[in-house]
């Protein structure tokens, strides 16, 4: 029996009804979330494919933790009926629906069936007929691509295993003749602040209502406790943490200020988010166009699958996937082997993987210890509505890693 995180918005996959769902590769580790239950079931052989949604990485985190392939489409490319729409308001983070599969070809097979189906259009009338373009699915085979990459996003440093596979993927693609260009994420700390504010545009109250009068699983109690902290106290904590850990400071202080005024009308909320989002979006896309990129490769997540007790303390990691919900870019996960003993050794080496006094990095190191043998992956992103190109690059990466 598998489950999803109670209340969602967590990669601690547990609930008070069904207990804890474990990673198929190690029962001491989480499969991720919030679509972790279906991914774990699929990877364990319980289904031929899995399904899920993705508001901040809920497809991509489980896929990277469990060794599955997935794609978060642009919002609107694949729609569903009778599901929650994520955070309220038109300026919320983009929500995508997708599948867990073993290969990229299986992703293409399932998307072709749905996106070109008149029957599907009848079931979901607000879904336009937007079939996959077969010619664009082979773009990586037909010409050499110009692909951007980054090993660190400038907000949360990934552990050695997660950065290693990006570097190796870049080398493998260069051997095939593709051009790889180092990409610098513009203003990552500001983008991260906007992302964390965007998760809960109405403040913590919206999510706390979900937990009200419910039995809270032990693994989520820290998360719920943090949600209950007064905003003034969060501001003070954020200031103190700014001298110790920038990521923790940003996460602690990223709430919508003047909340009572913002709650008066939805319009004020949307204007607040969209104004700053537009600046980040322009900076990102302008750099993309300057480099004439076809796609972008980066770490799938900052860490492989972690022990069950850690997700509530690793909220700083969510930006790795949430960035592409903020931008509404299609983003996919491709498995790239497993963590090795050298990765574990380098993680423990302070001279190589420096943490200093940064609490966030110290927690990350503790969470990632002894991960040898666990799946690791890379993430591929393209501009909005270029799912075909994203899938094509994913297939190219899959090919070089399976040689």
Specify the residue positions occupied by each region the protein language model found:
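Glycine-rich, small-residue loops and helix-cap segments
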Residues: 48, 163, 167, 180, ...
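Acidic carboxylate-rich catalytic motifs and surrounding loops in phosphoryl-/glycosyl-chemistry enzymes
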Residues: 2-4, 182-190, 335-338
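A short helix-breaking turn/cap at a secondary-structure junction
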Residues: 69-170, 176, 183-187, 358-360, ...
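Charged, often glycine-rich, active-site loop that binds/positions anionic groups
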Residues: 14-19, 192-206, 346-350, 354
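Short glycine/serine-rich loop segments
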Residues: 1-114, 327-335, 377
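Flexible loop/turn segments at secondary-structure boundaries
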Residues: 5-9, 57-60, 154-158, 189-191, ...
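Short, well-ordered beta-to-alpha junction loops that form the rim of enzyme active sites
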Residues: 3, 152, 298-302
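Short acidic, glycine/serine/threonine-rich loops at helix termini
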Residues: 9-13, 60-65, 82-84, 93, ...
């Amino acid at each position: 029996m598998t489950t999803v995180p109670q209340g969602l918005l967590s990669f601690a996959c547990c609930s008070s009804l069904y207990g804890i769902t474990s990673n198929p590769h190690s029962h001491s580790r989480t499969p991720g979330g919030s679509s972790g239950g279906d991914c774990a079931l699929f990877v364990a052989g319980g289904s031929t494919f899995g399904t899920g949604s993705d508001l901040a990485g809920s497809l991509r985190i489980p896929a990277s933790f469990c060794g599955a392939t997935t794609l978060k489409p642009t919002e609107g490319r694949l729609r569903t009926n009778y599901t929650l729409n994520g955070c309220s308001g038109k300026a919320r983070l983009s929500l995508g629906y997708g599948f867990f599969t073993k290969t990229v070809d299986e992703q293409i097979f399932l998307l072709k069936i749905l996106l070109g189906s008149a029957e599907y259009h009848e079931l979901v009338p607000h879904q336009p007929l937007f079939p996959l373009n077969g010619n664009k699915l082979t773009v990586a085979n037909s010409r050499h691509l110009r692909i951007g990459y980054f090993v660190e996003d400038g907000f949360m440093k990934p552990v050695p295993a997660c950065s290693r596979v990006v570097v190796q993927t870049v080398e493998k693609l260069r051997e095939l003749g593709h051009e790889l260009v180092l990409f610098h994420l513009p203003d990552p700390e500001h983008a991260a602040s906007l992302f964390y504010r965007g998760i809960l545009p109405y403040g913590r109250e919206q999510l706390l209502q979900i937990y009200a009068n419910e039995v809270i699983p032990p693994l989520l109690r820290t998360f719920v406790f943090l949600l209950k902290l007064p905003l003034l106290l969060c501001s003070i904590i954020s200031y103190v943490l700014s001298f110790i850990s920038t990521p923790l400071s940003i996460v602690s202080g990223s709430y919508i200020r003047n909340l009572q005024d913002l709650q008066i009308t939805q319009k004020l909320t949307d204007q607040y988010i969209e104004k700053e989002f537009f600046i980040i979006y322009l900076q990102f896309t302008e750099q993309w166009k300057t480099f004439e990129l076809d796609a972008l490769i980066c770490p799938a997540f900052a860490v492989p699958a972690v022990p069950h007790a850690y997700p509530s303390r690793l909220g700083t990691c969510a930006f790795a996937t949430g960035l592409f919900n903020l931008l509404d870019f299609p983003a996919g996960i491709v498995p790239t082997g497993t963590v090795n003993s050298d990765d574990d050794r380098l993680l423990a080496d302070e001279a190589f993987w420096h943490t200093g006094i940064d609490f966030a990095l110290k927690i990350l190191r503790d969470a990632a210890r002894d991960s040898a043998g666990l799946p690791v992956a890379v993430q591929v992103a393209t501009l909005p509505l270029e799912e075909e190109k994203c899938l094509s690059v994913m297939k190219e990466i899959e090919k070089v890693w399976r040689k």
